Curated annotation (Swiss-Prot):
GO molecular function terms listed in the Swiss-Prot or TrEMBL record: phosphatidylglycerol-prolipoprotein diacylglyceryl transferase activity
Entry keywords, A to Z: Cell membrane, Membrane, Transferase, Transmembrane, Transmembrane helix
Function: Catalyzes the transfer of the diacylglyceryl group from phosphatidylglycerol to the sulfhydryl group of the N-terminal cysteine of a prolipoprotein, the first step in the formation of mature lipoproteins.
Record's keyword annotation contains Ligase: no
Protein residues bound to a 1,2-diacyl-sn-glycero-3-phospho-(1'-sn-glycerol): 137
Encoding gene, per UniProt annotation: lgt
Family: Belongs to the Lgt family.
Protein EC: 2.5.1.145
GO CC term (a single one): plasma membrane
Transmembrane segments: 22-42, 52-72, 89-109, 203-223, 235-255
Localization of this protein: Cell membrane
Leading EC class: transferase
Name of the protein described by the UniProt record: Phosphatidylglycerol--prolipoprotein diacylglyceryl transferase
Annotated organism of origin: Staphylococcus epidermidis (strain ATCC 12228 / FDA PCI 1200)
Higher taxonomy: Bacteria, Bacillati, Bacillota, Bacilli, Bacillales
HAMAP family with a match to the protein in the record: Lgt (MF_01147)
C-alpha cells in the first residue's frame, strides 16, 4: 500500500493475477460486523441464532446484483459502449439504494419462507445495515470515488481531518470534499440512535427510522457529490429516492400507530409471518 505520495492504492494485495481491493475488504468487514451485532439482538428477542444466516446470504447476493443493475441502468450511455465493464464491481459502481431494494425484496421472501415476522427482522437488522453502510463508505474513499466538488487543502485542514484523509482526497491534481466521510459519520450516529431507541419504539419503527435517518443524510450529502446518478439534468436519482423513502416511511409509521397500535419491539418475543390467508 503506497501512502508516501499522498495516495492509498485501491489494491490491498495481489494473489497472482487476482487483485484484492480495499473496497471489497471494507464492505465485507462492514457486513461481518453488522452480522455479529444483529446476532446479539436475536438472542434478546428469543430467536434462534441461525435465523439470519439465510436472510443475510440471499439479501447480500441479490442486493449486490440489484445494486449493480441499478447503477448500470442510470449510466447506460457509458456501459452500452463498455459492456465488459458491467460485471467489474470491484471498480466501484454499486448503488446503495439499489442494494437496499434488492435486499429488502429478498429479505421479505425469505421471511415468508421461514415464517418470520418481517418487521421484527427489519428492526433487528436495521442498525447493522446503517453501520455497514457507514463502514462501506470507506471503500469509496479507498477507490477515490463518491467525493464532492473541489476544495482547497486549507479547507480540509480547517476540518481538522487526519492527514491521510487529506492526502487521499488529492485526486488528479485537485482536493475534493470528503463526502464519503460526511455520510459515514451520519450513518454511525444513526446506528447509535437506532440501537439506543429500538426497545422504546413500536415494532417496525426501527427499520422505518433507519430509512428516514439514512435518507435525510443522503439527500444533503448527495447535493455535494460530483458523480451523482441523474434522472434529468437537474434531478439526482438518490435525492428523489430519498424523498420518496422518507414520505413512505413517515406515512406508514403514522398509519400503523393509528390503525393497529403495534406492540413495542422489546415486548415482541419470537414472532411469525403476520399475514394469513383469508378462509
Amino acid at each position: 500500500m503506497n501512502i508516501t505520495l499522498g495516495y492509498i492504492d485501491p489494491v490491498a494485495f495481489s494473489l497472482g493475477p487476482i487483485q484484492v481491493r480495499w473496497y471489497g475488504i471494507i464492505i465485507a468487514c462492514g457486513i461481518l460486523l453488522g452480522y455479529f451485532i444483529a446476532q446479539a439482538a436475536l438472542k434478546q428477542v428469543g430467536l434462534h441464532k441461525d435465523t439470519l444466516i439465510d436472510i443475510i446470504f440471499y439479501s447480500a447476493i441479490v442486493g449486490f446484483i440489484v445494486a449493480r443493475i441499478y447503477f448500470v441502468t442510470f449510466q447506460w450511455p457509458y456501459y452500452m459502449n463498455h459492456l465488459s465493464e458491467i460485471p467489474k464491481i470491484w471498480h466501484g459502481g454499486i448503488a446503495i439504494h439499489g442494494g437496499l431494494i434488492g435486499g429488502l425484496i429478498s429479505g421479505i421472501i425469505v421471511c415468508k419462507i421461514k415464517n418470520l415476522h418481517p418487521f421484527q427482522i427489519g428492526d433487528i437488522v436495521a442498525p447493522s445495515i446503517i453501520l455497514a453502510q457507514g463502514i462501506g463508505r470507506w471503500g469509496n474513499f479507498m477507490n477515490h470515488e463518491a467525493h464532492g466538488g473541489p476544495v482547497s487543502r486549507a479547507f480540509l485542514e480547517h476540518l481538522h481531518l487526519p492527514d491521510f484523509i487529506i492526502r487521499n482526497m488529492y485526486i488528479e491534481g485537485q482536493y475534493y470534499h470528503p463526502t464519503f466521510l460526511y455520510e459515514s459519520i451520519w450513518d454511525v450516529i444513526g446506528f447509535v440512535i437506532l440501537i439506543t431507541l429500538r426497545k422504546r419504539l413500536k415494532l417496525g419503527e426501527t427499520f422505518f427510522g433507519y430509512l428516514i435517518w439514512y435518507s435525510v443524510g443522503r439527500f444533503f450529502v448527495e447535493a455535494m457529490r460530483t458523480d451523482s446518478l441523474m434522472l434529468t439534468s437537474h434531478i439526482r436519482v438518490a435525492q428523489l429516492v430519498s424523498v420518496v423513502l422518507i414520505l413512505i416511511s413517515v406515512i406508514f409509521v403514522i398509519y400503523r400507530r393509528v390503525k393497529y397500535q403495534p406492540i413495542k419491539y422489546e415486548n415482541s418475543g419470537p414472532l411469525t409471518w403476520p399475514i394469513k390467508k383469508a378462509k
